[in-house]
Regions:
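Non-catalytic, usually N-terminal nucleic-acid engagement modules in DNA/RNA processing proteins
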Residues: 1-126
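Short beta-strand/loop segments at the ligand-binding rim of alpha/beta enzyme cores
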Residues: 6-10, 52-57, 128-134, 186-198
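A structural motif corresponding to the C-terminal end of an alpha-helix
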Residues: 79-89, 119-133, 156-159, 184-194
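Glycine-rich phosphate/ribose-binding loops and adjacent secondary-structure elements
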Residues: 133-198
Length: 198
């Protein structure tokens, strides 16, 4: 009987408790932090983290969506370029469909993945280390967008190293979405805001 070991990195998210933060820093834990909410904490982490701990920067797109604020993609790119040598990976600035608290239209749902992909391409061309950029595929989006990510090649004909999978944990079909998405991916993937095993 063959045993297959699947290795993964666990990233601890959030920066609301200074004691937990200090402990994670001391332990050399991997961190996922939002550039929208955690820049001060990221600055401290960049200065003090061990060489073997990993830092994943999230755009904060969902937090911006819930607060009704926008994020400048150019500001985000400039910020990432300023700390890129200390980061392992960073999430693209993705587009969440519609507005918080309002019913999402069909047009909202169709436009969001297209706008996200356009942001990915825009960012990729402007980052110092674009190979660290993670495009995000959201539950509810047409799987053509995931296949697009899998087929995409940069100007050196290299495929993506990472793809982010973003489940909607509050809707039916989560297990089917994760199974279908993960079965097709032969790249490193990150499952956003999801930390239970199925």
């Amino acid at each position: 009987k063959e045993i297959v070991l699947i290795m993964f990195d666990l990233y601890f998210a959030g920066a609301r408790n200074k004691f937990a933060d200090a402990y994670l820093l001391k332990c050399g834990a991997n961190r996922l932090q939002s550039q929208l909410l955690d820049r001060r904490n990221i600055s401290e982490w960049v200065l003090k983290k061990s060489d073997n701990s990993k830092l994943f920067i999230d755009s904060g797109a969902y937090s911006a969506y819930t607060k009704g604020v926008s994020i400048s993609v150019d500001d985000y790119i400039m910020y990432l370029n300023s700390i890129t040598s200390k980061c392992t990976i960073f999430a693209q600035l993705d587009t969440i469909p519609g507005q918080m608290g309002k019913v999402k239209t069909k047009e909202d749902r169709l436009n969001a993945p297209r706008l996200s992909w356009e942001n990915f391409l825009y960012m990729y061309d402007r980052l110092k280390e674009p190979e660290k950029l993670v495009p995000i595929f959201h539950q509810g989006e047409d799987y053509d967008w995931l296949w697009n990510m899998l087929e995409w090649r940069n100007n050196k004909e290299e495929p993506l190293s990472y793809i982010g999978i973003s489940p909607a944990v509050d809707v039916p079909g989560l297990e089917e979405f994760l199974t279908k998405s993960f079965d097709k991916l032969l790249v490193i993937r990150h499952c956003f805001e999801y930390s239970i095993f199925i």
